[in-house]
């Protein structure tokens, strides 16, 4: 898979991508760009996401054979909770299980809000839980369900994978999936 920066190519006005029958473009929407990261309450920057959706739709129209995978960061929906509850510093026990679940719920809320904006723009975005398609081994994250992701892309969906929490075999029992 080749990684392209949609916005850079759009801004520079480049007219073509390398031609490939199954070209995949991975677009990472940074959490600090699509959310008000410093806000105490999690908020999506709707105008920014709507503009990104508009540009993505134009990109797809221009390069219809290119398949897209969207990634998004945690922004104000994840980072403040991870830091507040010190989720990466201590084992998950007792009330910290609730803290972990609350963080995961917040990230799902973010994915649902983003999906709603993309759907209203006519883009067939399918939110996927990153922790369901990724695994960890020796502190390295890897795709564990590549066939499922390939099938979703081949059907014509645009998978949306985002910041997430995952259980691992380490001191804290969990990690942030953010890249």
Residue ranges and their predicted role:
Residues 26-30, 71-72, 128-129, 160-162:
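Short beta-strand segments
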């Amino acid at each position: 898979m080749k990684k392209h920066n949609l916005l850079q190519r759009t801004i520079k006005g480049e007219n073509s991508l390398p031609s490939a029958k199954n070209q995949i473009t991975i677009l990472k929407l940074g959490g600090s760009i699509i959310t008000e990261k410093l806000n105490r309450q999690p908020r999506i920057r709707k105008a920014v996401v709507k503009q990104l959706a508009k540009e993505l739709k134009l990109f797809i129209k221009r390069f219809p054979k290119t398949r897209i995978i969207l990634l998004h960061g945690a922004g104000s929906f994840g980072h403040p909770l991870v830091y507040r509850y010190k989720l990466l510093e201590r084992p998950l026990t007792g009330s910290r299980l609730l803290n972990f679940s609350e963080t995961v719920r917040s990230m799902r809320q973010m994915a649902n809000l983003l999906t709603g904006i993309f759907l209203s723009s006519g883009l067939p975005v399918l939110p996927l839980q990153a922790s369901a398609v990724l695994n960890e081994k020796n502190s390295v994250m890897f795709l564990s369900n590549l066939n499922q992701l390939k099938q979703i892309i081949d059907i014509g969906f645009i998978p949306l994978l985002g910041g997430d929490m995952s259980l691992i075999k380490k001191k804290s029992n969990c990690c942030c999936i953010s890249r």
